[in-house]
Amino acid sequence: MKALSKLKAEEGIWMTDVPVPELGHNDLLIKIRKTAICGTDVHIYNWDEWSQKTIPVPMVVGHEYVGEVVGIGQEVKGFKIGDRVSGEGHITCGHCRNCRGGRTHLCRNTIGVGVNRPGCFAEYLVIPAFNAFKIPGNISDDLASIFDPFGNAVHTALSFDLVGEDVLVSGAGPIGIMAAAVAKHVGARNVVITDVNEYRLELARKMGITRAANVAKENLNDVMAELGMTEGFDVGLEMSGAPPAFRTMLDTMNHGGRIAMLGIPPSDMSIDWTKVIFKGLFIKGIYGREMFETWYKMAALIQSGLDLSPIITHRFSIDDFQKGFDAMRSGQSGKVILSWD
């Protein structure tokens, strides 16, 4: 079968032929329809320090997809041939304390599809049936293919009660924009998203977010005054991993504010911890999606009218995968979808 693989320990990704993966007793074989390129895939393409330490070579990559069930392991129940599915990209062990306690998203032995084991940038993918999620009929293939990053956004945004709250989202990448859109959809009062990339901020404006602020050109305190905010943000969603953005968030949070962090900062990031202490801030780390509560909420949000379509900016045939990666690497894109049909 055709597959996009990391064949060499250098920059790039290559189309190759690999065997169709073998189906285990508890697995599903999925024929891939559409995949989306994640920031993680760009890291792997660029072969940065994280990738060099993490990714085995050669390996099929990718973990954002939608497809059709074409094979079912003999011990699998609840699925049938033809089911349209996406899937949770974190494969968990099932035997650690968190897994046995129903907190599988906190599994200490998590293995990543397309990171630690073969991924979805291929004609076929095998995953445990436990990880598959049936896509409702009224959700398009395009939207289903981005459920993985959408799940990151939903998990982060819905970590706290947002109704009537003022929310700051730092980082207008696709996940940050989706998180801001979720916050607005579920009843936040003001949702402000910040970045220095004007293309991405314009995407955010198309999603109906209260205010998209280019912090290279305007002061966040001025934006708050413009919106009539007098006490600071109630909730912060840190999606950028950029130390200056996090420091600004700490400066502008109200006392008792709550922060969910999905962005990965450098290990040596320094902050003024007195702001956390004296403001009584609560900071929560976010990794992946809750299995599978986040997935049900994703589907429900779309079915209740949340429109994510503006975040999908580029579509290519898989044969034009290089154009897709070029678009992602340019910083001038939202989500990029590759069609395998």
Curated annotation (Swiss-Prot):
Subcellular location per UniProt equals: Cytoplasm
Instruction: Show the active-site residues.
Output: 40, 43
Q: Which GO terms describe its cellular component?
A: cytoplasm
Q: What is its EC number?
A: 1.1.1.103
> Which reaction does this enzyme catalyse, per its entry?
L-threonine + NAD(+) = (2S)-2-amino-3-oxobutanoate + NADH + H(+)
- Cofactors (names): Zn(2+)
GO terms for biological process, alphabetical: L-threonine catabolic process to glycine
Pfam families, from UniProt?
ADH_N, ADH_zinc_N
Principal place of residence? cytoplasm
Name the residues annotated as site: Important for catalytic activity for the proton relay mechanism but does not participate directly in the coordination of zinc atom: 148
Name of the top EC class for this enzyme: oxidoreductase
Q: Where along the chain is NAD(+) bound?
A: 175, 195, 200, 262-264, 286-287
Copy the pathway line from the protein's UniProt record. Answer: Amino-acid degradation; L-threonine degradation via oxydo-reductase pathway; glycine from L-threonine: step 1/2
**Positions with a binding annotation for Zn(2+) 2:** 93, 96, 99, 107
Q: Which residues bind Zn(2+) 1?
A: 38, 63-64
Entry GO MF terms? L-threonine 3-dehydrogenase activity; zinc ion binding
Describe cofactor binding as the record notes it.
Binds 2 Zn(2+) ions per subunit.
Q: Which family does it belong to?
A: Belongs to the zinc-containing alcohol dehydrogenase family.
Query: Self-association or partners: how does it assemble?
Result: Homotetramer.
The protein's role, per its UniProt record: Catalyzes the NAD(+)-dependent oxidation of L-threonine to 2-amino-3-ketobutyrate.
Q: What NCBIfam families does the entry give?
A: PRK05396.1, tdh
What's the protein name?
Answer: L-threonine 3-dehydrogenase
The scientific name of the source species is Shigella dysenteriae serotype 1 (strain Sd197)
Gene transcribed to yield this protein: tdh
